[in-house]
Amino acid sequence: SMPMECISINKEGIMLYQDKKGYEDYWRKHQVSPIARDIWSYTPGKTPVYQKQTTFGGEDREPVWAPDGKSFYYLSEEKGSFNIFQRTPGANTSKQITFHTKHPVRFLSMASEGKLCYGYNGEIYTLVPGGQPQKVNITILSDKIDKDIIRQIRSYGATDIAVSPKGKEVAFIMRGDVYVLSLIHIS
C-alpha cells in the first residue's frame, strides 16, 4: 500500500498527493526531517509513473491542481511559515503566492474556477491567483433560545426532603427542581 493524503486529480487523471512517511504531529511547525511530507504525482497507465514534485527538507502539503491542470498549488514552509506556492510538475522551482508571517497558512482548497481558499490565524481567506488575499467576513447567528446553565453550589435551601425506603438515596427539591442523591456514592 502507498500512504497518500490530500489527493487532487486533474482532468487527465494525474494524481497529486502528499506522502506520509511516518508519524509527526500535523500541527507542528518548522519541522525539517526525513519524515517531512513531500508532494508527489502519480500518472496511471500500463507503466505507472511516480514523480517527486518537491524537494524541500521540511513540510510540503495539501496539493491542489490549477483548473488548467498544468500547474498546482500547495502549502510549504520553504520560506519560513506555511504559505501557498505554485509549481509546474517536474519543475525545480516554485513561485510563492502568499506572504503571511508569524502564523501558518492551513486548509488549502480550490474552487473549480480557480479561486483559492485557506485558513490563516483563525480566519478564512480567498485568493484569486494574481490578486490579493481577501478575508471572508463571517457572521455567526445563533438561534439558541435556551438560557445558559448557571452552576450553583448550595448548602441550604432544600425543601420537601424524602429518604428512600432502604436509606440509600435522598430526594429533595431545591429552587423548583427535583434532585436525587446517592448516600452511598457521594461525590
Segments (PLM) and residue ranges:
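Loop/turn segments within WD40 beta-propeller blades
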Residues: 110-112, 163-166
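A flexible loop/linker signature enriched in serine peptidases of the S9 family
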Residues: 1-8, 13-40, 44-61, 67, ...
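Signature of short aromatic-glycine-proline-rich micro-motifs recurring in repeat-based ectodomains
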Residues: 153-162
